[in-house]
């Protein structure tokens, strides 16, 4: 399909894909909140509540700590922009990556690391002890989850013979030549995506059930709205990454209106399914102690390491 698309069309597809995911983020997070409320036997807020919250926060006054600096003010914008670049790079609605420059696995890992780095650094920049604890937890969680995600994606790259998401997705769409290896990589990557989505028991940095929300403690107004929007967008992007890699069916094979609309509906339903499953899994688990999180993450890394061993042995 790439040969039939000029650069102008790819730019349009990239921007449209990013805007669609950005605008639907409050809906997906609202559905997640509704599922949590129903499983807790509560009525809960409506699925449109997150749109109202963001709109309300944008109208509120923005107050910053006197000790905060540039990092504190940049963080919400970095969260949004880094995830938008990832959203543009995923081969989600069509079989090619609309923004090929951001579709390499190395770029993906660096963008996720950039997201985490600024999120943690903004907490340290405030001088708040609560934000500092949340920042240290975020960095520790990154140390635990990034090797798992990197190794599982590396196994997929070895199977596809390329580190580009487009090639990996299209290779897996044609069939799993190494089924055992792919299944183990799927489990490890799915586990890593679940952790990156910040679901319970891995929401140790945001800690939204606690009195103080970690690095977001000192944010207000438009900054808080952008930060929450960016965190929600990260959840949608991680779910979309899993869909693009392991559920690549239903994408548009040609540039007709019917194919594009069908691809849009099917893909969004797949992302919604991942969100619903993650929300159900989240609400069946209790919040874990932060000091014991590494006992759980080792399981995912073991699956990724086992997938690599299986690839070496040709399984």
Swiss-Prot record:
Enzyme class, spelled out? oxidoreductase
Q: Give the location in the cell.
A: Cell inner membrane
- Please give the PROSITE patterns that the UniProt record associates with this protein: COMPLEX1_ND1_2 (PS00668)
Key word NAD present: yes
Q: What is its main location?
A: membrane
Q: Any ranges marked Cytoplasmic in the topology annotation, and which?
A: 32-73, 120-140, 203-228, 278-289
Residues passing through the membrane, by range:
11-31, 74-94, 99-119, 141-161, 182-202, 229-249, 257-277, 290-310
Q: Name one GO cellular component term.
A: membrane
Q: Name one GO molecular function term.
A: oxidoreductase activity
Q: What's the short name of a Pfam family annotated to this entry?
A: NADHdh
Query: Which residues lie toward the Periplasmic compartment?
Result: 1-10, 95-98, 162-181, 250-256, 311-315
Question: What keywords are assigned to this protein?
Answer: Cell inner membrane, Cell membrane, Membrane, NAD, Oxidoreductase, Transmembrane, Transmembrane helix
Does the keyword NAD feature in the UniProt annotation?
Answer: yes
What is one GO biological process annotated to this record?
Answer: anaerobic respiration
Q: How does it sit in the membrane?
A: Multi-pass membrane protein
What's its EC?
1.-.-.-
What PANTHER family does the entry give?
FORMATE HYDROGENLYASE SUBUNIT 4, FORMATE HYDROGENLYASE SUBUNIT 4-RELATED
Q: What does this protein do?
A: Possible component of hydrogenase 4.
Query: Which family does this protein fall into?
Result: Belongs to the complex I subunit 1 family.
Question: What name is this protein filed under?
Answer: Hydrogenase-4 component C
- From which organism does this entry originate? Escherichia coli (strain K12)
Q: What does UniProt list as this organism's lineage?
A: Bacteria, Pseudomonadati, Pseudomonadota, Gammaproteobacteria, Enterobacterales
